Swiss-Prot record:
It is an enzyme of class 6 (ligase). PROSITE patterns: GATASE_TYPE_1 (PS51273). This is Carbamoyl phosphate synthase arginine-specific small chain. The active site is at C277 (nucleophile), H362, E364. Pathway: Amino-acid biosynthesis; L-arginine biosynthesis; carbamoyl phosphate from bicarbonate: step 1/1. Heterodimer composed of 2 chains; the small (or glutamine) chain promotes the hydrolysis of glutamine to ammonia, which is used by the large (or ammonia) chain to synthesize carbamoyl phosphate. The lineage of its organism: Eukaryota, Fungi, Dikarya, Ascomycota, Saccharomycotina. It is found in: Cytoplasm. It comes from Kluyveromyces lactis (strain ATCC 8585 / CBS 2359 / DSM 70799 / NBRC 1267 / NRRL Y-1140 / WM37). Small subunit of the arginine-specific carbamoyl phosphate synthase (CPSase). CPSase catalyzes the formation of carbamoyl phosphate from the ammonia moiety of glutamine, carbonate, and phosphate donated by ATP, constituting the first step of 2 biosynthetic pathways, one leading to arginine and/or urea and the other to pyrimidine nucleotides. The small subunit (glutamine amidotransferase) binds and cleaves glutamine to supply the large subunit with the substrate ammonia. Belongs to the CarA family.
Length: 409
């Protein structure tokens, strides 16, 4: 077998001190080789312990602007599936969005040869085509120890022959970047006689979240993150708030005020609402709660979350660096729904009297376990009750036939 590694360009991965990223001595550097685009990059270094699912993770908008470290020792061995193939709902069949969102990836060992029946190209070719930096030959165990101790950190990947990047702080308008620029419409299958109508607030939604809604019999209208959702909410059977990247306070002047208005509208008190990940955090902020930054976040496919209402443990898929401060939730409104059994952080909240709940983890889980996919069924049960209560009063008058059928960038 040819020694591809020996001919690959040399590269360096540097992790900077959180307290003083501009210091020339305040960093740890690792030597490796480049197998992605021949460009250097900088971003916030985070790590995932997921064993599989690198194509899904790299196309998850929640990772926008970050450098993703994989703890799985060998990455790339099953290649990359088609980014064009779509399912019956016109959703991407294998990826979570049309393009890679991570700024760079760090692996211990890159698999120069791949094999899988869905693969159409190698991970290296994909990264090069998408202009994404990728470095291999890195001691990722040592990297994770650093990130575990000092938290998610400014970092750089420098490729031989490319410019030398400077560490930068996380961007602040990430949701604005990844959100659809105009509403689009995803239709349920024609075999569904009376589909529900869901308004989805796109803060960086994954394809599989939309799929989990439409495959259960919902027509989904996806709106930009800053859309005045209250103006159309009475036309829908439910509101959904998606996942997304970055600090939730970046949406304090956009999504949060709209959600607050939605929660306070008297005629919409019975309207079902479901939020996931960033959507959970934004719902908490709109309700008067606060969020906190975690040291190194939770990014894995095997994190136990306890349902505080039943005592049942769910094994969950997670990807977040912030969490809701459960002690700041208003006593008269929400109560904790799930708790992380590893670090005891909040994993969800549920309203004491209204059909509203949210989770920090990803029940749609692609990749990852499907233990908590039943939460989508619970959401649909809430919409069934809402439809029975409101009857013909809830009618979609928005002209969905004039909308796009996929994300608008």
């Amino acid at each position: 077998m040819p020694n591809f590694k020996s001919t690959a360009p040399k590269a360096k991965f540097a992790i900077y001190n959180n307290s003083n990223p501009d210091s020339e001595s305040g960093f740890v550097e690792f030597q490796g080789y480049s197998f992605g685009a021949p460009v250097s990059c900088s971003g916030e270094a985070v790590f995932t312990t997921s064993l599989v699912g690198y194509p899904e993770s790299m196309t998850d908008p929640s990772y926008k602007g970050q450098i993703l470290v994989f703890t799985q020792p060998l990455i790339g061995n099953y290649g990359v599936p088609s980014g064009e193939e779509r399912d019956d709902f016109n959703l991407l069949k294998y990826l979570e969005s049309p393009h890679i969102h991570v700024r760079g990836i760090v692996v211990a060992e890159y698999a120069w040869r791949y094999s899988h029946w869905t693969a159409v190209e190698s991970l290296a070719t994909w990264c090069q085509r998408e202009n994404v930096t990728a470095i291999g030959g890195i001691d990722t165990r040592a990297v994770v120890q650093i990130l575990r101790e000092q938290g998610s950190s400014p970092s750089t990947i420098t490729v031989q022959g490319s410019f030398i990047p400077k560490p930068i702080k996380p961007e602040t308008d990430l949701v604005k970047i990844v959100s659809t620029k105009k509403p689009f419409f995803v239709k349920a299958l024609s075999s569904v006689k009376t589909p529900f109508n869901v308004a989805l607030i796109d803060c960086g939604v994954k394809e599989n979240i939309i799929r989990c809604l439409v495959e259960r019999g919902a027509n989904v209208t996806v709106f930009p993150y800053d859309y005045p959702i209250t103006s159309v909410a009475n036309q829908f059977d439910g509101i959904f708030i998606s996942n997304g990247p970055g600090d939730p306070v970046q949406c304090m002047e956009s999504t949060v005020p709209e959600l607050k208005k939605l929660l306070e509208t008297n005629t919409l008190q019975d309207l079902p609402i479901f939020g996931i990940c960033l959507g959970h955090q934004l719902l908490a902020l709109a309700s008067g709660g606060k969020t906190i930054k975690l040291g190194y976040g939770n990014r894995a496919h095997n994190i136990p979350a306890l349902d505080l209402t039943t005592g049942q443990c769910h094994i969950t898929s997670q990807n977040h660096g912030y969490a809701v401060d459960v002690d700041t939730l208003p006593e008269s409104g929400f109560k904790p729904f799930f708790q992380n059994l590893n670090d005891k952080s909040n994993e969800g909240m549920i309203h004491v009297s209204r059909p509203i709940f949210s989770t920090q983890f990803h029940p749609e889980a692609k990749g990852g376990p499907r233990d908590s996919a039943v939460l989508f069924d619970r959401y649909f049960d809430n919409m069934s009750q809402y439809r029975a209560l409101k009857g013909p009063k809830v009618k979609l008058t928005l002209n969905t036939s004039s909308l796009a059928t996929e994300r608008v960038f």
